[in-house]
Amino acid sequence: MEKEPKTMLRFGTIGTGWISNSYVDGALDSGLWQLTAVYSRTKEKGLAFAAPYGVKTVFTDLEEMAATDKIDAVYIASPNKLHIEQARVFLEHGKHVICEKPLSAHAKDVAELQALAKERGLIYLEAIMFMHLSLIHISEPTR
């Protein structure tokens, strides 16, 4: 029996700092993700981040990036205060969102975007490493 080929998830990243490199490297190592776009406030920084990954598409306009058909999802690693509005833009354009912590300082904002994602059949989640949470380690002996 032949296995179905794995579908690559095309994603873009917002943010060009070290955490973005770390996330992108892990995503690419999985063999399931393809970095296809980068957003930065300046074209120069965006191009510098994109070059080692062979990415040619760099945006300086979020709406433009959200509207592109070159991505299925976005990874948000911008300053915390921008997370909610940036996530909203991408969810409204039908893109899955993975956002660095915190999603927001306000639970009502998160609940609103969770509802929007659910309504549109999208994934909206916080990029958090569960394996390092104490709850995971506490539960391990019971497995």
Each predicted region: which residue ranges?
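Short active-site oxyanion
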Residues: 34-37, 72-74, 124
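Aromatic/hydrophobic pocket-lining residues that form π-stacking "cages" and hydrophobic walls in ligand
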Residues: 46, 86, 113, 138-139
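Helix C-cap/helix->beta junction micro-motif
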Residues: 53, 93, 119-120
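Beta-loop-alpha module in the N-terminal Rossmann-like domain of NAD(P)-dependent dehydrogenases
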Residues: 56-114
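Rossmann-fold dehydrogenase core element
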Residues: 112-129
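Residue-level detector of conserved catalytic or cofactor/ligand-binding positions
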Residues: 134-143
